UniProtKB/Swiss-Prot annotation:
Keyword rRNA-binding on entry: no
Binding site for Ca(2+) 2: D152, D154, T156, K158, E163
Residues binding Ca(2+) 1, per UniProt: A109, D112, E114, E119
Provenance organism: Homo sapiens
PANTHER family per UniProt: CALPAIN SMALL SUBUNIT 1 (PTHR46735:SF1), CALPAIN, SMALL SUBUNIT 1 A-RELATED (PTHR46735)
Taxonomic path: Eukaryota, Metazoa, Chordata, Craniata, Vertebrata
Database matches in InterPro entries: EF-hand-dom_pair, EF_Hand_1_Ca_BS, EF_hand_dom
Protein name: Calpain small subunit 1
Domain of life: Eukaryota
Length: 268
């Protein structure tokens, strides 16, 4: 067993699936995302060099990373995604907006009533084409696989209705934040705009973590486009929620074995 200290510090809380859905679904979802309310890793160690020097360097690097992330989890109070429910279990008090979303989800998800990574990629890319002010290379299949994985609470490899709704609501909110903090209207978030955007999303990180994120998700000039911004926040939200679920006594520390650690980190 080994100890993993607190992760970060913050809180957090797709476009038509191909020709069969036609432009109507894309138009409706594009409208939904436009109507969003405003506001809103790290280095492993090196090998063991002569006389133990390499091992000492490795431990210092790892210790620095853990120290950087250990200040964060205490203030994170996410609302977990609602439990999965069968599509037919529609509550009488659902709003018309939720009922409409269920109908759209049914069209998108198909007979299995789940959204795959490919279906998610199609819907997100159809929506972002309606927003030329968002600079993006498009959502790739690997990005969407990662997004599905971190939201996939029952490890089916797909998103059920509640999982997809939770993801979609976050994307709407984060899109509004992205536009708000793109102050120079470049279509990207630059390194100086990033802290404000992340704090508006509820993630209060230290400088070391911001630098790590910029190196991982931004281009060589330090600019982060929309798909990388969303991908990063989806991952942060999922990591925070996973940590909180394991930190049952609220100490800011969790203890996991190697199998639990691999399960947590590899399927994401």
């Amino acid at each position: 067993m080994f100890l993993v200290n607190s992760f970060l510090k913050g809180g957090g809380g797709g476009g038509g699936g191909g020709g069969g859905l036609g432009g109507g679904l894309g138009n409706v979802l594009g409208g939904l995302i436009s109507g969003a309310g405003g506001g809103g890793g790290g280095g492993g160690g090196g090998g063991g060099g002569g006389g133990g020097g390499g091992g000492g360097t490795a431990m210092r690097i790892l210790g620095g990373v853990i120290s950087a992330i250990s200040e964060a989890a205490a203030q994170y109070n996410p609302e977990p995604p609602p439990p999965r429910t069968h599509y037919s279990n529609i509550e009488a008090n659902e709003s018309e907006e939720v009922r409409q979303f269920r109908r759209l989800f049914a069209q998108l998800a198909g007979d299995d009533m789940e959204v795959s990574a490919t279906e998610l990629m199609n819907i997100l890319n159809k929506v972002v084409t309606r927003h030329p002010d968002l600079k993006t290379d498009g959502f790739g299949i690997d990005t969407c696989r990662s997004m599905v994985a971190v939201m996939d609470s029952d490890t089916t490899g797909k998103l059920g209705f509640e999982e997809f709704k939770y993801l979609w609501n976050n994307i709407k909110r984060w899109q509004a934040i992205y536009k708000q903090f793109d102050t120079d209207r470049s279509g990207t978030i630059c390194s100086s705009e990033l802290p404000g955007a992340f704090e508006a999303a509820g993630f209060h990180l230290n400088e070391h973590l911001y630098n790590m994120i910029i190196r991982r998700y931004s281009d060589e000039s330090g600019n982060m486009d929309f798909d990388n911004f969303i991908s990063c926040l989806v991952r942060l939200d999922a990591m925070f929620r996973a940590f909180k679920s394991l930190d049952k006594d609220g100490t800011g520390q969790i203890q996991v074995n190697i199998q639990e650690w691999l399960q947590l980190t590899m399927y994401s």
